Amino acid sequence: MIEAGHNMKDRILFEEIPHGTEYLQTVIDAMLQSKELEVDYQSYYGHRATYHMHPYAMKVYNQRWYVVGYIREKEGIRNIALDRTLELTIGTETFVLPDDFDAEEYYANTVGIFVNENQKPQKVVVRAFGKQVEYMRSLPLHHTQEEIKTVHEEYIDFRYKLCLTPELSTHLLAMGEKVKVLEPEELRSEIKNRLLATIQNYE
């Protein structure tokens, strides 16, 4: 299929990933060789640091490349965004990929890229209205999505089992008035407070 579409590149469009792609081959080489990466990194908040990372896996999310792996300085598994990387080189230290690490399982309980290993997944219930129902049926918010209540031509309640993360809140906020969080109260309050803060920006 790829070869068949080679001459149609002006008609088959993919989302552009603006930054970070220049490091992809280096990361892949480090993963293949089981070599540590030395990363000169600047966070979105401006903090700059050098990290030594065992690259376990890679993931694209929201037009950004991320590398997940063990960071020595953090003493745990973390993500780094390649578009925040200032310099990246392969070191001499080798590592062994843990037998119990599975990239899909690592992200299984979250929406997006953020993982808090101390957080347990919990029940989340979201009510969708109107056309948003079919949209969420065709593109579930999370793989645990279940329909638990249907009121014909009015709304459907979807249930999930996942961790509460900033990205989950962002996804729900992006749906605007087409959804309503029913449970848990913690998430419901957060969404409400962020909507009120948004309204204040327009006053």
PLM region spans:
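Bulky hydrophobic/aromatic content
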Residues: M1-Q42
